[in-house]
UniProtKB/Swiss-Prot annotation:
Naturally occurring in which organism (per UniProt): Nitrosopumilus maritimus (strain SCM1)
Record domain UmuC: where: 6-194
Catalytic activity: DNA(n) + a 2'-deoxyribonucleoside 5'-triphosphate = DNA(n+1) + diphosphate
Entry annotation: catalytic residues: E112
TM regions (residue ranges): none
PROSITE patterns noted in UniProt: UMUC
Protein name, as recorded: DNA polymerase IV
Site positions (Substrate discrimination): Y15
């Protein structure tokens, strides 16, 4: 039986990298891509920061105010609002390239995917290394994006490996090297292990994967419950039988309508917008998906475009939440609106399955 070969491909500092590609003069500067809240000013959080910004402690998830404080000495620091439409376009181009090189392609998110390449590499890790380099070169040539690739016999190890030599890394963990690769890594490096679990291991004087490996499955089940305990027991041994499942990017769902008359009247536009919300909601219900980002778009009478979007706190499939968010976006978009609107669109993105595998942290 052929050794399974799985790639995990992860795009380096994706949103910020996209901004550097669009504006090459940003490459030498600290760049933070921000999700601004609707409270105004610097309220909000950092979505992604480039490596220059990270050197100063500006990183994903921290408040924008903190990031600005940490980058005070860098007068050239740049803080940009997220542009999901642009990032989705870039992602789609890269995903199509990856899919061409795979036996089985599994889309995970805008900036990551799994590829099963067992057949085309004949289970040969040397051939897999060449294939990975081909993918990296093709993506760079066609999109200018860099990515990091982890190669191993399963999804778990490949995901850990892709984070090993960032940015622009390529890490190969063949079956005989799995044990040595994992031994000295922190337990937190295992996907799904959260702060609480790590803290509990610290209280038990266990820090590395090698340390945790000394525990038997009964001890782990007693400490964390059967499901999580079994997962940890297998993970620290590099055991993962989960298959790469065919899943293509469903980056967004949207509907657009040409209005009966050009208008900038709020009530008229709201009526049309709410109708679009119902149509979009029907799509996500049929596909059993949740969304985390909502956007509206205008084509104005002069044929120029205008878009506005908002990231929600949590994924949802609620029509009420969709309508409420769209209503807010419409009000904001119409402030100081001079041109009339010819076409109107509503879309949802940042999609996920509403039922399916939960992250291991759900159980802790």
């Amino acid at each position: 039986m052929e050794t399974r070969i799985v790639f995990h491909i992860d795009f380096d500092y994706f949103y910020a990298q996209c901004e550097e590609i669009r504006s090459p003069e940003l490459k030498s500067k600290p760049v933070c891509v921000c999700v601004f809240s609707d409270r105004g000013g610097d309220s909000g959080a950092i979505a992604t920061a480039n490596y220059t910004a990270r050197k100063y402690g500006a990183k994903s998830g921290i408040p924008i105010v903190f990031a600005k404080k940490r980058l005070e000495e860098r007068k050239d620091a740049v803080f940009l609002p997220v542009d999901f439409d642009y990032y989705s376009e870039m992602s789609e181009k890269a995903m199509k390239i990856m899919e061409e090189f795979s036996d089985v392609f599994e889309y995970v998110g805008r900036d990551e995917a799994y590829l099963d390449v067992t057949k085309r590499t004949e289970g040969d890790f040397h051939k897999a290394s060449h294939l990975a380099q081909q993918i990296k070169n093709s993506i760079r040539e066609k999109t200018k994006l860099s990515c990091s690739i982890g190669i191993s016999p399963n999804k778990l190890i490949s995901k850990i490996a892709s984070d090993f030599q960032k940015p622009d890394g390529l890490t190969i963990v063949s079956p005989e090297k799995v044990e040595g690769f994992l031994e000295s890594l922190k337990i937190r490096d295992i996907p799904g292990i959260g702060k609480k679990t790590e803290q509990r291991f610290t209280e038990m004087n266990l820090e590395t994967i090698g340390d945790v490996k000394r525990l038997d499955v009964f001890t782990l089940n007693k400490e964390f419950g059967r499901k999580s305990g079994t997962y940890i027991y297998n993970a620290v041994r590099g055991i993962d039988d989960e298959l790469v499942k065919e899943r293509e990017p469903s980056i967004q769902h949207g509907k657009i309508v040409t209005l009966k008359k050009d208008s900038k009247d709020y009530e008229f536009l709201l009526e049309n917008t709410l109708e679009l919300c119902k149509e979009v909601h029907e799509i996500i219900q049929k596909k059993n998906q949740m969304f985390k980002s909502v956007g509206i778009s205008f084509v104005q009478s002069d044929l120029s475009n205008k878009t506005k979007s908002k990231m929600l706190r949590n994924p949802t499939m609620s029509l009420e939440e969709l309508e409420k968010t769209v209503e807010q976006l419409l009000r904001e978009a119409l402030e100081n609106q001079t041109a009339t609107i010819r076409r109107l669109g509503v879309k949802v993105s940042e999609l996920s399955e509403s039922q399916g595998q939960r992250d291991i942290t759900s159980y802790f």
